[in-house]
Amino acid sequence: MSETVAGEWGRPVNTAAHQKGGIHDDETAADLGFEGGTVAGSIHMEQFLPLLLDVFGDAWWSTGVLSMYFRQATVDRQPVRCFLTPGNNGQARVWMENEEQQMIMEGTANLGECDLPTALGARLDALRPAGELRILKNMAVDQQTQAETRVGSEFMDNQLQVITESHENFTSNAAYGQRVLSNTQVVRIFDPAEQRLAEAAIGPFVGLYGGIEVAFENGPVLEETAYESTCKVVGLGDSPKTEILWRESQLLKDGQPVARMLKMDRLMKNSSPLWD
C-alpha cells in the first residue's frame, strides 16, 4: 500500500448562506435537523487540488476524474482536511475529515478511463429499485434535455474571493488563453440543463448534494467560453429520509466532449408537504 498524504487544514466558506429557504440557509438547515447552513460538497472538492496535482501532474487538468460520495455535512468555516492514498492500479483513494476525525466525504481519483469503477459510479451500479416517489414521481430514467451555458468572469471573480484552495490557472489566462474554472464553477456550468430537467420535480422541497463526480475528457473548462450541456436522468432511488435523483451531464464545445458530471441529489422528505 502506498503512503497516505495529507493536505493542509482548510476552512471552507458557505458561499450560499444568503439563499433563504435552502439547505445552505442556517434557519432552514436547522429546521431539517442540521447544525446550520451546510457547505456545498462541490466547494469541499476544490480543497483536494494540491494533492491531485502532486500525484497526477498537469494531466489532471485535461483528463482528471474526481468522484466523491458525501457522508456528513459541515458548516461555515468548519476546519477540514483532505487525504489521498495512491493505488497501484492508477486509482487513488481520497477522503476528507474534520477535527474529530469524522469522515466528511470519500471517493476515488484517477486519470481518464480506469478499469475500476469510480466511487460514485459503483453506487449508481448498485442502486436498488425505488420505492414510493412523491417529489420525483413525474421523472423517469432516460429523460434528458440540453442547454447552452457559460460561466462569466464576474461570477468567477466572486468565487475566487472566498475559494479554499486557489491556483494560478484560476487567476491567470497564461496557460490556456482563458482562466480555468475551479470545481465549484465547473459544477455551476452544468446548471442550465440540470435545472431544466429538474422542473418535473414537484416542489416545494429542500435538496442537497449526495455525491458528485467531475471527469475531464478534454479539459480544462474555461471562463467566458460558450458550451453546450446535455443532462439525462440515469437513476431514481429513495431512503427513509430522502428521495434520490441521479443525473449525468456532458459538456461539449463545437460538438466535442470537454467534461462530464455524475451527480446524486438527495431531496429531503421532511421538507415536502407531499410527505406530511
Task: Tell me what each language-model feature is.
Residues 1-63, 116-211, 272-276:
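Hot-dog-fold acyl-thioester-processing enzymes
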Residues 1-13, 75-140, 218-276:
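HotDog/MaoC-like acyl-thioester-processing domains
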Residues 58-74:
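An N-terminal domain-cap segment
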Residues 65-70, 211-218:
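Short structured motifs
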